[in-house]
Amino acid sequence: LQSYSQISKVHYIPPLTNNKGVAFGSSIPIDQYLYLSTPSTENVIVTITPLNGDAPTTYNDLSNGNPIRYDIGSSWNNGFTPTQLFVDHENTGGDQAIKAGFLIEADCPIYATIRYNAGSQAGALVSKGDASLGTNFRAGMMTMGSKDVANNNNNFYSTANSFISVMATQDNTTVSVDLPNAIVGQTTISNYNY
């Protein structure tokens, strides 16, 4: 059992999605960036490769006293706009999602965190590195809000978002999502095979 799963030499950052029904407003993820850190006192070489084919960016000076902030951009442009990290909720099985995300490689173990702001809210997701590789996964989520309590002015139930983001690390890999009978939800989730 590995107890330090967040530190790794390789991190796979899959695409994320915006909330369904939030094309405008304060829930759009802006100020998106990767935050890289390490316990190493020596300089670590890190390469960040966008999965859309853009040129990689290499840093030679990551250390415990010098974390790196890699700016991704904003999804706000008079409404939701996809970035290299966030894809539209209606394109999670399309070209946007296939070309989004990042591969982060370092010559020494590092931490990689996704951070973003959305209006008065903020979010962060921590990569699990090589410890997250595998072929079988389970996920559980809590329900968000109540459709019976929602009102017209602030329909939290329709804008809350729980999702799973999966990324194949080898070409021509088939990713299948099997939903058990116990699943509870308002929206049908589709299986995407690439």
Describe the residue ranges of each PLM region.
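Bacterial N-terminal signal peptides
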Residues: 1-2
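Intrinsically disordered, low-complexity linker/terminal regions across diverse proteins
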Residues: 5-194
